[in-house]
């Protein structure tokens, strides 16, 4: 039976209505869970619009299938007020993972860097050095800590303890990863979030595929 008519984003042509069945959705949930494990204790906060199958499958249905918890952003009197509720809602919900798109990822990074700059030039320089060190250690993700870079592990661990952990606390302190979609996420952004301990696992999908086709995961990932 038909479940929804989902419209494509219109990236390459005019948006088109895609008829998706209940089995389309349940099959994609099963496929997604073969790549990323979701314990029943997990929580997520849906920030993305609720009118697309990305939020349906990865935000709602996989959580329902695993008996996990879902929250949505508190609606404000205006769209801008709703956006302003996101940071507070994240701290309240303490999500284990979040859905993201490139625009949202850029905004998160901008806010993090603004907060670091506000702490003064010493903290800013230290954060930049810690970030560069983590980049060298992590490489492309798949080859993290390989070869001589294993020697950097204690240094990266120290930076994580004194710097990156404090950044993660702004996301509730429980955030383990993002699932990214919607468009190609710049590899530099992927490296940034990986360095601070909140990997953004890039996925690829099509509305016609309900939508997940492939994705990086905690076990298999490569920043490209």
Regions found by a protein language model. Give the residues of each.
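Structured core elements
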Residues: 4-7, 17-19, 45-46, 71-72, ...
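Hydrophobic/aromatic ligand-binding patch that stacks against planar heteroaromatic rings
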Residues: 7, 62-63, 89, 192, ...
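Conserved ATP-binding loop and adjacent catalytic segment of the adenylate-forming AMP-binding
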Residues: 71-73, 151-157, 169, 173-180, ...
């Amino acid at each position: 039976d038909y479940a929804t008519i989902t419209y494509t984003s219109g990236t390459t042509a005019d948006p088109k209505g895609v008829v998706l069945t209940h089995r389309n959705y349940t099959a994609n949930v099963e496929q997604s869970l073969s790549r990323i494990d979701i314990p029943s204790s997990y929580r997520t906060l849906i920030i993305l619009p609720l009118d697309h199958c990305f939020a349906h499958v990865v935000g709602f249905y996989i959580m329902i299938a695993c008996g996990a918890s879902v929250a949505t952003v508190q609606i404000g009197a205006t769209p801008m007020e709703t956006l302003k509720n996101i940071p507070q809602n994240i701290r309240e919900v303490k999500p284990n993972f979040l859905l993201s798109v490139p625009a949202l990822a850029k905004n998160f990074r901008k806010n993090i860097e603004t907060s670091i700059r506000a702490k003064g030039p010493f903290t800013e320089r230290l954060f930049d050095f810690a970030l560069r060190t983590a980049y060298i250690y992590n490489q492309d993700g798949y080859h993290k800590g390989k070869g001589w870079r294993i020697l950097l592990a204690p240094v990266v661990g120290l930076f994580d303890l004194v710097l990156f952990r404090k950044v993660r606390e702004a996301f509730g302190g429980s955030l383990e990863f993002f699932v990214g979609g919607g468009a190609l996420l710049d590899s530099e952004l992927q490296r940034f979030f990986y360095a601070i301990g909140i990997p953004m696992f890039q996925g690829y999908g099509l509305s016609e595929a309900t939508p997940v086709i492939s994705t990086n995961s905690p076990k298999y990932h490569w920043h490209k």
